[in-house]
């Protein structure tokens, strides 16, 4: 569960290392985001000569959370940390690679690019 002020790692090669959630998108009173949800983030830590700079604001899709996601068969998929993939204005990934596993819950039409770039789909 990601909320405002939550820090997330970045699971792509866009140049950002850490981002902070500044808004959960999808309704005025929406408080929490989970895997597959789009959030508005600001870059808190970035590498030199990357595609993004510290302080810039982007959309991002949550790909891993510590709280995990419950499957219909009752199993729970959990991760060691929270991570997101940065998106541009057209909702396409900024980076060309995705690091670490992602879940099958991302397999919607608009997020298939992230699933295809990921090394492992759980």
From Swiss-Prot:
It comes from the Bacteria. Pfam families: Ribosomal_L14. GO terms for cellular component: cytosolic large ribosomal subunit. The keyword Ribosomal protein applies. PROSITE patterns: RIBOSOMAL_L14 (PS00049). Keywords: Ribonucleoprotein, Ribosomal protein, RNA-binding, rRNA-binding. The keyword Ribosomal protein applies. SUPFAM superfamilies: Ribosomal protein L14. GO terms for molecular function: large ribosomal subunit rRNA binding; structural constituent of ribosome. GO terms for biological process: translation. InterPro entries: Ribosomal_uL14, Ribosomal_uL14_bac-type, Ribosomal_uL14_CS, Ribosomal_uL14_sf. Belongs to the universal ribosomal protein uL14 family. Part of the 50S ribosomal subunit. Forms a cluster with proteins L3 and L19. In the 70S ribosome, L14 and L19 interact and together make contacts with the 16S rRNA in bridges B5 and B8. Binds to 23S rRNA. Forms part of two intersubunit bridges in the 70S ribosome. This is Large ribosomal subunit protein uL14. The lineage of its organism: Bacteria, Pseudomonadati, Pseudomonadota, Gammaproteobacteria, Lysobacterales.
């Amino acid at each position: 569960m990601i909320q405002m002020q939550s820090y997330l790692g970045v699971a792509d090669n866009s140049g950002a290392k850490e981002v902070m959630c500044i808004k959960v998108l999808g309704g005025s009173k929406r408080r929490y985001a989970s895997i597959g949800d789009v959030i508005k983030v600001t870059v808190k830590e970035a590498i030199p000569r990357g595609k993004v700079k510290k302080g810039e604001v982007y959309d991002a899709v949550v790909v891993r959370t510590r709280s995990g996601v419950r499957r219909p068969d009752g199993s729970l998929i959990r991760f060691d940390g929270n991570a997101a993939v940065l998106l541009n204005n057209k909702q396409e990934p900024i980076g060309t690679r995705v690091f670490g596993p992602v879940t099958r819950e991302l397999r919607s039409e608009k997020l298939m690019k992230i699933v295809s770039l990921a090394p492992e789909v759980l």
